[in-house]
């Protein structure tokens, strides 16, 4: 199962499905609703996807793949200091959340709706993303930049970042860069006291 596909039409269908899954929830979304939202007949949907599960997997895979790609790029382009790397990861995560919001919300709240085969297939992407965070947090811990248990620190950081999809206003005064800077500042300040 490799649901990442470069077809522009398929990408648009995935984007529309993500929006509908966020609005209605995966369980309440029917194939007929998806087809209507996408402007196609129900049967035509199966030209692109085997079933609704594959659509969900495609939404989550594309969102997670994009997050992983952006995070790797941010780390490759930032400096070597733990502070810069922590900031780059936070900024990349926020940019992913805020530019690909629906796919991320679906990944956060509908992971449990994936069947076992899809979860197994997608776990490598999620694990790779979490490993990047753990590595950056380990570097910050080793440098004394932050303190705490790596598992707990990573869960608190991810939770704080992920919650921004609920309250952040892209039209507001704060930009993703501001949020990333503030998060890292709070983490570093708490270790200094």
Feature locations, PLM:
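Helix-turn-helix
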Residues: 12, 16, 20-54, 58
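Conserved hydrophobic residue
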Residues: 26-27, 146, 174
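C-terminal peripheral helix-coil segments that are non-catalytic and often amphipathic
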Residues: 92-95, 99, 130-139, 158-160, ...
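Short coil/turn segments at alpha/beta junctions that flank glycine-rich nucleotide-binding fingerprints
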Residues: 23-24, 78, 100, 143
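Short, structured helix-loop boundary elements
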Residues: 10-11, 31, 53, 57, ...
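Amphipathic alpha-helical segments used for helix-helix packing
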Residues: 98-117, 166
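Hydrophobic alpha-helical connector segments
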Residues: 58, 73-102, 153-157
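Amphipathic alpha-helical packing segments from all-alpha helical-bundle domains
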Residues: 62-72, 117-142, 151-155, 178-181
């Amino acid at each position: 199962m490799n649901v990442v596909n470069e077809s522009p039409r398929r990408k648009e269908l995935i984007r529309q499905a993500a929006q509908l899954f966020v609005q209605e929830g995966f369980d309440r979304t029917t194939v007929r609703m998806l087809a209507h939202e996408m402007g196609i007949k129900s049967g035509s949907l199966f030209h692109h996807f085997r079933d609704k599960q594959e659509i969900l997997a495609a939404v989550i895979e594309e969102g997670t793949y994009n997050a992983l790609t952006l995070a790797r790029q941010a780390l490759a382009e930032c400096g070597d200091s733990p502070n810069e790397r922590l900031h780059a990861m936070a900024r990349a995560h926020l940019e992913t959340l805020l530019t690909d919001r629906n796919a991320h919300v679906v990944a956060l709240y509908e992971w449990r709706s994936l069947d076992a085969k899809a979860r197994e297939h997608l776990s490598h992407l999620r694990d790779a993303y979490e490993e990047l965070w753990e590595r950056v947090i380990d570097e910050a811990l080793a440098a004394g930049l932050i303190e705490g248990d790596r598992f707990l620190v990573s869960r608190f950081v991810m939770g704080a970042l992920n919650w921004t999809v609920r309250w952040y206003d892209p039209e507001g005064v704060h930009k993703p860069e501001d949020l990333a800077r503030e998060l890292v500042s709070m983490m570093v300040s708490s270790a200094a006291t």
